[in-house]
Amino acid sequence: MTSTLQKNRAGAAFPFDNSYAGLPARFFAAQTPTAVAEPWLIKLNEPLAVELGLDVETLRRDGAAIFSGNLVPEGAEPLAMAYAGHQFGGFSPQLGDGRAILLGEVVDRSGRRYDIQLKGAGPTPFSRRGDGRAAIGPVLREYIISEAMFALGIPATRALAAVTTGEPVYREEVLPGAVFTRVAASHIRVGTFQFFAARGDTDGVRALADYVIDRHYPDLKDADNPYLSLYSAVSERQAALIARWLHVGFIHGVMNTDNMTVSGETIDFGPCAFMDNYDPATVFSSIDQHGRYAYANQPGIGQWNLARLGETLLPLIDEEPDGAVDKANAVIRAYGERFQAHWLAGMRGKIGLAGEEDGDLELVQALLSLMQAQGADFTLTFRRLSDLAGDAAAETAFAASFREPEACGPWLAQWRERLSRDPQTAAERATAMCRVNPAFIPRNHRVEQAIEAAVENGDFTLFEALLTVLAKPYEDQPGFAAYMEPPKPSERVLATFCGT
């Protein structure tokens, strides 16, 4: 009787309204999470739970059991999604959720549909000899980065909860196990389309495309060519998203086609990192040995991934193969222009320009070249430039960003000359710049310090402090000024790891 009551209470916490589970059986494998020994709730994202219309009181009480997979709420239809993918350029026809289980979907108070997924919830038919589990480090990393991206205003999956399992996981060393609860607009990837296309399953591609249009792009239902319009819309969202990554120095680290969503959200934060000193060739991921997914390569990789999506949609775009290729190629060519427009618009904002002039690109590129040559910190340089825009006395602090402070003089002269023709007042400009140039990002060394304290000592104090700081990245927080600072040489993170 007790377990039934608990299940009923848990069910009330999630007003599930599942749709993906209604797709044909070949789209997924039904899979119940595997129970764990002693779950403990590390963190519940209560504001997000409220936004999703969840019962926070129930989640506080039963969250450890629910978010570990020990207690499956009523209305859930747990499943592992099928997908394929190009990983570092090589195609794998079957990947799928090897350690993630989709519990179901909820519709928030604004009518938006979201997936609720457990990562590290045990093996699935797609586990490929893996244990289906996650270690606490990658779980905390994803929690931190997800919420930081949200606060920065960058479309990304969200963190609803993190729990420890009371069980070890075995990687290069024995680590505490954990489960992460992810919220996403959906978990449909470029690789999901590839899964069906690789099998010659055009009906599957069509069913998936129809589902994506209905869920993410309903305004395309009545388009003359809805599948071509879908391809164009996904391309537009990815161009805008990747431009936003570059604006904050974000390096995803593993831009495989199975890690690119069709919703336009950033997903899968395993080896991701934020750049310290500006260098377009920056790579952190330990598995990216040739720099395929380096900072500056991300726009081109986005285009490459979208070309793979286009290949899957060709039979739907036009029955005549040559016509389909021509139409898809036009979308791919347009991606480059779209990305450049989004990137330049954002960079204009970062240096305080409200209007547009032909020389703006050269002015931006000159600053970036100077930053690279002078070893300037990406985030701090732009934040100090924001201060300088409103207070000429801040020039000393800005110049200190460069190895040779006097080196910034010629660029500052060009910048000020350009500002003289811009319509904003100094105060307006400084305010606008502070809204796009964060003071706080998830500094890699700070993330690692928080993870290390949790793994080695079970201490989540640094984790909580980091979440507090990163919730307001564009605000001055005098009590946390140290979190703005770049790492000391001894603190630098040189490589990040996927964690799987």
Curated annotation (Swiss-Prot):
Enzyme Commission number(s) of this protein: 2.7.7.-, 2.7.7.108
Binding site for Mg(2+): 259, 268
Enzymatic reactions: L-seryl-[protein] + ATP = 3-O-(5'-adenylyl)-L-seryl-[protein] + diphosphate; L-threonyl-[protein] + ATP = 3-O-(5'-adenylyl)-L-threonyl-[protein] + diphosphate; L-tyrosyl-[protein] + ATP = O-(5'-adenylyl)-L-tyrosyl-[protein] + diphosphate; L-histidyl-[protein] + UTP = N(tele)-(5'-uridylyl)-L-histidyl-[protein] + diphosphate
Cofactor: Mg(2+); Mn(2+)
Annotated residues for binding of ATP: 96, 98-99, 119, 131-132, 182, 189, 268
One Pfam family linked to the record: SelO
Keyword Magnesium on entry: yes
Any one GO MF annotation of this record: magnesium ion binding
Catalytic residue positions: 258 (proton acceptor)
Family stated for the protein in its record: Belongs to the SELO family.
NCBIfam families: PRK00029.1
Job of this protein: Nucleotidyltransferase involved in the post-translational modification of proteins. It can catalyze the addition of adenosine monophosphate (AMP) or uridine monophosphate (UMP) to a protein, resulting in modifications known as AMPylation and UMPylation.
Protein name stated in the entry: Protein nucleotidyltransferase YdiU
UniProt organism field: Rhizobium leguminosarum bv. trifolii (strain WSM2304)
Gene label: ydiU
